[in-house]
Amino acid sequence: MDLKKDKYFGTLLPQHDKTPKLIILSLGAGVQSSTLALMAAEGHIQPMPDCAIFADTGYEPPDVYEYLNWLEKQLPFPVYRVMKGNIRDDMVNSVDHGARFPTAPFYTVNAETGKKGMLMRQCTNDYKIQPIRKKIRELLGVGYYKHVKKNVWVEQWIGISTDEIARMKPARDKYIINRWPLLELNINRRQCQDWFEKRGHKKPTKSACICCPFHDDAHWQDMKDNRPEEFADAVDFDKKIRHGSRNVKDKLFLHRSAQPLDQVKFKPKKEQYDMFDNVCEGMCGV
């Protein structure tokens, strides 16, 4: 792919005249953010980021951690790994001990009425956005209860491609300006994969928690067929969350059918609605 021939996306980009004190890359270790990191490392995207930050939920597939170990060695800028806690352990402990349940978008069934629903998604904020935000403030030298100075700006690069425009969202902090370089280069996910192939780079897998309810059936089927240990873990987790916790009384399920995961007959991909593209903001799955 000749990057010089690609057109800019223009109107979708934030127009700002701020000079950032820090440029950080939000690294998920999936296809898009890894492409972004390696393009920056090779000088295709400038200026060079000051660092990348990977927010570890503690429940990523083993392949993601293996790939991240490789990727770190290819980059001329540091990669900081940050972590709030292990999302699996936190959720299971909340069920076992009646503690507050860390909310993820699990599918629900009311025990009395049988009505189906979905919990609010708070996991991305708690286990991705906030740990990255905390690290940014640390890099700026700003304490937890301190205000970032008025004229201090941070530019945050996020790996969203042209086929995921619905996931674009502004930063929640006024001093952080989100930017999407893959959109500026008019690059889609397939082109990211082509870029890896042409350069012979190690290919990343999709970065998302093993237990993520936004997995489509194709992902669950692939996990069941090719990564049976991960699938068995997901099935075990699905059973453990079934009866919720102190603040959740409905029955909970990982699969949108609200059936036990090991009993679901997965549908072909063409029949599935992609929850990642339309709901989850660009911190997971990239």
Give, region by region, the residue ranges found by the protein language model:
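Nucleotide-activated chemistry modules centered on ATP-dependent adenylation/adenylyltransferase
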Residues: 2-286
